[in-house]
Amino acid sequence: MSGITLPSLTNVLQSAGMAVHGHPSAPGSTQLPPLHQLNISSQPSSQPPQPSLQYSEPAQSTAASDDMDSDVDRTKHPSGIVPTLQNIVSTVNLGCKLDLKNIALHARNAEYNPKRFAAVIMRIREPKTTALIFASGKMVCTGAKSEEASRLAARKYARIIQKLGFAAKFLDFKIQNIVGSCDVRFPIRLEGLAFAHNHYCSYEPELFPGLIYRMVQPKIVLLIFVSGKIVLTGAKVREEIYEAFENIYPVLTEYKKT
């Protein structure tokens, strides 16, 4: 399964509200993707601990959140389903070196354990997000439900750093990953799909219960479950999430369990 690892799947599932160890993720909980995917040089002493790889699906259906709103352009969603954005991961450069120990001592809702991971972990309630703040001045913001909320949260973190006496700026803000999810509301024959689309699929149910579908255009990774739950990740803009789902939906209907 080149290009996507089981630990990174854990992070994607948790950010989409999926469950690990059979328990749904807590609302607003966040997990960060591997830092190498974000092009951030953090030089951590060790990688953050990863949860063990036991998966189950959400305890509650997401069907209600996937219904079309009256103000949605139906011509762009012929399937009648609009994926819900679950997590936005963004990065920003604060443009100055940071004393992480000082930040952890004086900022609220901040933790720093350099023996585990070389970044301050900071949280704010509105928008409900988590930031990783590195000594280099690079920052990762995760947990927002929209691009605007991610930018707002990143600015709030930068302002907190400024108030602590650092000459923090707000440079090179960039959306690195958008995670969405939806429910097609019918079971899917994953074996048949994997066989017919073997050039794009990885399906190893003994390792991971979902089928991994790597779409070429747009370049999106989809996690497809037998229940009809879908997770989409790898987008830079939300339109890529929507386009990828509309591309895959007719394929999924071909492999609907009867």
UniProtKB/Swiss-Prot annotation:
Q: Show me the sequence repeat boundaries.
A: 85-161, 175-252
Region: Disordered; residue ranges are: 19-80
One Pfam family, please name it: TBP
Q: Does the keyword DNA-binding apply?
A: yes
GO-annotated cellular components: nucleus
Keywords (alphabetical) are:
DNA-binding, Nucleus, Repeat, Transcription
Question: Which terms does the record give in the GO molecular function aspect?
Answer: DNA binding
In its keyword annotation, does this UniProt entry include DNA repair?
A: no
Q: Name one GO biological process term.
A: DNA-templated transcription initiation
Q: Please name the InterPro entries in this protein's record.
A: TBP, TBP_CS, TBP_dom_sf, TBP_eukaryotic
Principal localization? nucleus
- Give the UniProt subcellular location, in the record's own words: Nucleus
- Role: General transcription factor that functions at the core of the DNA-binding multiprotein factor TFIID. Binding of TFIID to the TATA box is the initial transcriptional step of the pre-initiation complex (PIC), playing a role in the activation of eukaryotic genes transcribed by RNA polymerase II.
Q: How does it assemble?
A: Belongs to the TFIID complex together with the TBP-associated factors (TAFs). Binds DNA as monomer.
Q: Which family does it belong to?
A: Belongs to the TBP family.
Q: What is this protein called?
A: TATA-box-binding protein
**Organism this protein belongs to:** Acanthamoeba castellanii (Amoeba)
The protein's gene is named TFIID
